[in-house]
């Protein structure tokens, strides 16, 4: 984890080319130890900086010429013994030349893996036709915005965010007809 916040002053106060900026860079790399919390993961790869940081505060030529940076923070959770899982992440792509940001915050996916809702807990006799019906579920939520660095927390940017929600519920079954033909109807909702 590293945070740098240089105060930049170019030229003399009162001159037409005078510039004063407070720049910063946040750099963070993290990966959770899988043994720390079984069933969940957390990782972060953050390199977030103001657009003037590379121009006025870079410590190497490569850093000064770098125009694109990106950051991602991710979390996922699986509930052991259940069909449920959740993943969430956020990402930011920056262009220091134009001072623009592309933000995806949050992206969330909730899954329910394949299960048989009509299957009896204790099978007695022959399997019924409806016990072969399986279901899955996937729900996705995405939210994104593009804005200038100086406008990112404005009311207008928040109002212009693009967001969407998507459901996927496949229902299927497989039946054996005359011991030679497999019939597998599927419905997607």
Give the residues covered by each predicted segment.
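Outer-membrane beta-barrel proteins and related beta-barrel translocases across Gram-negative bacteria
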Residues: 1-189
């Amino acid at each position: 984890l590293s945070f740098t916040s240089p105060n930049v002053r170019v030229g003399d106060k009162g001159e037409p080319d005078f510039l004063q900026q407070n720049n910063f860079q946040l750099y963070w790399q993290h990966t959770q130890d899988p043994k720390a919390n079984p069933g969940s993961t957390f990782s972060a790869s953050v390199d977030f900086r103001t657009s003037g940081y590379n121009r006025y505060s870079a410590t190497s030529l490569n850093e000064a010429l770098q125009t694109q940076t990106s950051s991602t923070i991710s979390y996922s959770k699986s509930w052991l013994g259940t069909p449920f899982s959740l993943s969430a992440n956020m990402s930011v792509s920056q262009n220091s030349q134009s001072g623009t940001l592309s933000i995806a915050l949050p992206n969330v996916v909730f899954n329910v893996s394949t299960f048989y809702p009509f299957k009896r807990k204790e099978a007695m006799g022959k399997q019924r036709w409806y016990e072969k019906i399986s279901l899955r579920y996937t729900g996705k939520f995405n939210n994104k915005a593009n804005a200038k660095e100086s406008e990112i927390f404005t009311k207008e940017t928040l109002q212009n965010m693009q967001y969407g929600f998507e459901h996927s519920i496949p229902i299927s079954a497989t039946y054996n007809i005359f011991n030679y033909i497999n019939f597998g109807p599927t419905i997607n909702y």
